[in-house]
């Protein structure tokens, strides 16, 4: 770099701080325009190209399955729904299906229609995947999954996607 283009440390920091402030304020404006709050104030966002609006926070089944008292876990999920959390994530693999079972109990009695429900499949063939889906539907006590995705494509025998 020649001397004409060299900046002092003070100039660099001044410009960097100004750029950071501009980016931060732009980020807030973009975030505010794309995440209008639901009735409870929790910001919502369109999920990819699905057109579905979900809360920007997601309740994860792994952690719900870790709660020792099922009544407490169900209470946590009901409180989350009451506060506007609409995105629930799970997988049959979480606690050997226990996380899906407890989430299924929590989503009974009309709560299912208040959430966007996602679960995952670890099988790599059609028959195994359909069996996994049927088992998840049974454990979650529902007739539909809003988003079903492959989990952990990391193994030696995974298809070359």
Each predicted region: which residue ranges?
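Short, well-ordered coil/turn segments that N-cap beta-strands
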Residues: 52-56, 85-86, 111-115, 142-146
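N-terminal secretory signal peptides and thylakoid transit peptides that target proteins
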Residues: 2-20
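Conserved, mostly hydrophobic/aromatic
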Residues: 47, 59, 88, 103, ...
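Active-site mouth loops of central-metabolism enzymes
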Residues: 60-70, 119-127
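Glycine/proline-rich, positively charged
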Residues: 124-161
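Acidic (Asp/Glu)-rich catalytic clusters
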Residues: 48-51, 104-112, 136-142
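C-terminal segment of N-terminal export signals and the immediately downstream linker at the start
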Residues: 27-57
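Glycine-rich, proline-tolerant flexible connector loops at the mouths of alpha/beta enzymes
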Residues: 90-106
